[in-house]
């Protein structure tokens, strides 16, 4: 049976994309409505009476999601959608295309390692596999950090406190100078900020946190009392003194006191660091990219 391709209609197609997701992915990855809602562009494969596949596109340079219904797999549909999505992104001027993340928004950082067929799909089509990343979680209702978690930072004269309105300019200046790729996340103003300051009052580190009821695409999996911690950063001159661990531990305590249950930390390679702060690995991802002008 032949198939044809058409543009994604983000709103009109939302219902069947949810059905396709449920059919193509295992129960460990149930449909994520907020993730589906963020798909604003892409290509749809149709066969017979309706759609059977999707390649979402983020013109900023990523393919956030690609799915083919199990009944229509191994017919070249996924390969065709991927090639067309790459062509669309190259035509828009993308210097590099990444799988899953890399655009303005993302459902997951990379291709989930527990979706082995998805990992093979990109690996066998000329995509470059970089480092793996992981997400971690902690049950804050049972969170008991080590008694020494904040001692090293405290002995170095570091104090921790959530931001007030007067801190906003200083926080953004710190991010711009130290972690420029995070400026947009801190500038959004939709999450709380925890600051580590040295004895002179200068910012030595920051992180973002939100919960319970955090606005996260993974809420259907994490639960209604979910929280998130992200963008944990310590100034280079202060690294290695326990400040990062102190920040994560304190943010976790604040979230737990507010009623957060599962706290999620996404997109990191620092497994041992977060384990020391009381978190455990949850999901792992392979990071894939495709150079411009390469074969698909």
Please report, for each region that a protein language model flagged, where it lies by residue.
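Short amphipathic alpha-helix that is part of the acyltransferase structural core
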Residues: 1-34, 51, 133, 147-182, ...
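A conserved beta-strand-loop-helix scaffold within acyl/acetyltransferase catalytic domains
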Residues: 24-42, 53-61, 179-234
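A structural microfeature
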Residues: 53, 131-134, 204-205, 283
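Conserved hydrophobic beta-strand within the GNAT/NAT acetyltransferase core sheet
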Residues: 63, 97-99, 229, 262-266
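A short, internal acetyl-CoA/4′-phosphopantetheine-binding micro-motif in the GNAT/acyltransferase core
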Residues: 63-74, 102-105, 229-239
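Conserved acetyl-CoA-binding loop-helix of GNAT-fold acetyltransferases
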Residues: 74-91, 231-234, 240-253, 257, ...
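Acyl-donor-binding surface of acyltransferase catalytic domains
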Residues: 83-156, 288-290
């Amino acid at each position: 049976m032949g198939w044809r391709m058409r543009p994604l209609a983000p709103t009109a197609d939302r219902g069947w994309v949810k059905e396709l997701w449920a059919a193509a992915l295992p129960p460990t990855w149930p449909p994520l409505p907020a993730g589906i809602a963020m798909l604003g562009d892409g290509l749809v494969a149709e066969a017979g009476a309706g759609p059977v596949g999707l390649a979402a596109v983020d013109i900023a340079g990523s393919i956030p999601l690609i799915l083919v219904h199990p009944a229509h797999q191994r017919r070249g549909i996924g390969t065709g959608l991927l090639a067309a999505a790459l062509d669309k992104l190259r035509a828009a001027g993308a210097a590099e295309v990444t799988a899953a993340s890399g655009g303005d928004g993302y459902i997951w950082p990379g291709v989930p390692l527990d979706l082995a067929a998805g990992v093979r799909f990109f690996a066998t089509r000329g995509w470059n596999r970089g480092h793996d990343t992981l997400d971690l979680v902690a049950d804050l209702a049972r969170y008991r950090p080590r008694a020494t978690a904040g001692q090293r930072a405290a002995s170095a004269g570091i104090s921790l406190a959530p931001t007030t309105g007067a801190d906003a300019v200083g926080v953004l200046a710190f991010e711009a100078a130290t972690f420029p790729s995070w400026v947009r996340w801190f500038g959004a103003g939709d999450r709380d900020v925890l600051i580590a300051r040295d004895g002179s009052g200068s910012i030595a580190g920051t992180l973002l946190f939100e919960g319970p009821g955090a606005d996260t695409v993974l809420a259907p999996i994490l639960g209604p009392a979910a929280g998130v911690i992200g963008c944990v950063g310590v100034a280079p001159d202060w690294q290695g003194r326990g400040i990062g661990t102190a920040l994560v531990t304190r943010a976790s305590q604040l979230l737990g006191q507010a009623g957060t249950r599962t706290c999620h930390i996404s997109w990191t390679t620092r497994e041992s660091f977060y384990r020391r702060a009381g978190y455990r690995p949850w999901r792992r991802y392979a990071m894939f990219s495709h150079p411009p002008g390469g074969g698909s």
